[in-house]
Amino acid sequence: MGTPIKKISTVIIKMVSSANTGYFYRTTKSALLSTKKLLLRKYDPVIRQHVLFKEEKISRKKN
């Protein structure tokens, strides 16, 4: 038998600026503990202000 497969406990997410500037952060979050989407107030360097960033899933391109 092979080695057991490890479960993924963290997920990479994309935090997109609510100011619609196109700026985003990539970060990780626990897949097991957090079920709600994140809302964080972070700095958007495009407009030089702190704005809300909303969580989105990262789309993966299939080859």
From Swiss-Prot:
Pfam families: Ribosomal_L33. One of its GO terms (cellular component) is large ribosomal subunit. SUPFAM superfamilies: Zn-binding ribosomal proteins (SSF57829). It comes from the Eukaryota. The keyword Ribosomal protein applies. The keyword Transit peptide does not apply. GO terms for molecular function: structural constituent of ribosome. It is found in: Mitochondrion. One of its GO terms (biological process) is translation. Keywords: Mitochondrion, Ribonucleoprotein, Ribosomal protein. Belongs to the bacterial ribosomal protein bL33 family. NCBIfam families: PRK00595.1, rpmG_bact. This is Large ribosomal subunit protein bL33m. It comes from Dictyostelium discoideum (Social amoeba). The gene is mrpl33.
